[in-house]
Amino acid sequence: MEAEGMLPPQSLSAKFEGSFAYLTVRDRLPTILTKVVDTLHRNKDNFYKEYGEEGTEAEKRAISFLSRLRNELQTDKPVLALTDNAEDTQAWNEYMERQQDLMENGQLVSWFKSPWLYVECYMYRRIQEALYMNPPMHNFDPFKEGKTQSYFESQQAIKYLCTYLQELITNMENMTEIQLRENFLKLIQVSLWGNKCDLSISAGQDNSQKLSPIDSLPDLQRFILVDDSSMVWSTLVASQGSRSSGMKHARVDIILDNAGFELVTDLVLADFLISSGLAKQIRFHGKSIPWFVSDVTKQDFEWTIKQTMAANHKWMSASGVQWKHFMKEGTWSYHDHPFWTLPHEFCDMTVDAANLYSTLQTSDLILFKGDLNYRKLTGDRKWEHTVRFDQALRGFQPAPLCSLRTLKADVQVGLQAGHAEKLSTQDPDWMTNGKYAVVQFSSPHREQ
């Protein structure tokens, strides 16, 4: 736990004019809302065909709701309590009250004055409220089109990756531990760089992967600022016991980020972990509602496996069939606890989602994918870049964990002294352009 009396640094916020948080709230969030409105409008004929006049009226009401929301955001209006009586409504409204208690000089919680992490998460929850409040549309995913497009536009890279995976599986029994480690490290890096494909950062523009992911790795190595991959490997090897005896049933939890190509890289890594015996069980954690434009929902997860099974490519199809089998037999499982779509820092989990924390404590390794998970791990705060990753977690230590993240927000810890300054000179946007990455590991058993 963090030292008693030590206050964490300030939250990143749009109140710091000119900051990345400010530019995101001012420019990118309204753009995303506009795209959601456009998506609803383009689907109005489908709503009418499926639900008749009720669908048409629901679409109009949702668009009106979202247009008001965009105005509230752009004019820095106070944040409003949710009114949709969903499973998480009370948790959201209680969190708003907590934020209000932190405001100074009688100010109200608002878009440009409150923590960026909170208001950005809140925007996506309000989009969901617009759908919840108009029942025929409550299951509509306004981001589905972009996610499926990302998958299809990355077909060539997916073919390369599935072919590579199937070759590995064919030769698995003859692999030495050195070869196994080498291929594990490659697939960790593929999963890491798969995170570059983030539609919320590009505000929904094409951000697909078209090159061979494996061939790209040597050129990308120098952009990894912290690489704790070897510690991840050591943790897995220690947790599974002897490879031949298979005495321990190691479980890996993967906290997913983006659908499309990135999800495929995660599935390939998970397949390798099972097929190699490095893990006996994989638990995937996704989002229960459409989230941050490209995040994985249960529908995206199932759709991706189904599409890969149906591919007109031998090794893609073989991979999809195997993944379906893993799900059916329970080797893989998908979970979407509501905490993942709350605005909380992960250090709040012990109190605000104790059941989820208890579940994660039984894991042998937790992989946190992507930028938003990193922001929640570190509290999205103005940490010094040299602060240890363990310290920035502020006591969140359910099990050995690793963040696989390409940098898309101006929070980064665990760097050597002088490294951030050197990067700022070479590339002023190094924290936000998705060009750099980290593989950062922390364990409750690790010596500090």
From Swiss-Prot:
Disulfide bonds: none annotated. Gene3D superfamilies: 1.20.930.60, Uncharacterised protein PF01937, DUF89, domain 3. Metal-dependent phosphatase that shows phosphatase activity against several substrates, including fructose-1-phosphate and fructose-6-phosphate. Its preference for fructose-1-phosphate, a strong glycating agent that causes DNA damage rather than a canonical yeast metabolite, suggests a damage-control function in hexose phosphate metabolism. Has also been shown to have O-methyltransferase activity that methylates glutamate residues of target proteins to form gamma-glutamyl methyl ester residues. Possibly methylates PCNA, suggesting it is involved in the DNA damage response. S-adenosyl-L-methionine binds at E262, D295. GO terms for molecular function: fructose 6-phosphate aldolase activity; fructose-1-phosphatase activity; metal ion binding; phosphatase activity; protein carboxyl O-methyltransferase activity; protein-glutamate O-methyltransferase activity; S-adenosylmethionine-dependent methyltransferase activity. A motif (Subfamily III RTxK motif) lies at residues 405-408. The keyword Methyltransferase applies. One of its GO terms (biological process) is methylation. Keywords: Hydrolase, Manganese, Metal-binding, Methyltransferase, Nickel, S-adenosyl-L-methionine, Transferase. Belongs to the damage-control phosphatase family. Sugar phosphate phosphatase III subfamily. Mn(2+) binds at D257, N258, D295. It comes from Danio rerio. Subfamily III proteins have a conserved RTxK motif about 40-50 residues from the C-terminus; the threonine may be replaced by serine or cysteine. Its cofactor is Mn(2+); Ni(2+). InterPro entries: ARMT-1-like_metal-bd_sf, ARMT1, ARMT1-like_metal-bd. This is Damage-control phosphatase ARMT1. It catalyses: beta-D-fructose 1-phosphate + H2O = D-fructose + phosphate; beta-D-fructose 6-phosphate = dihydroxyacetone + D-glyceraldehyde 3-phosphate; L-glutamyl-[protein] + S-adenosyl-L-methionine = [protein]-L-glutamate 5-O-methyl ester + S-adenosyl-L-homocysteine.
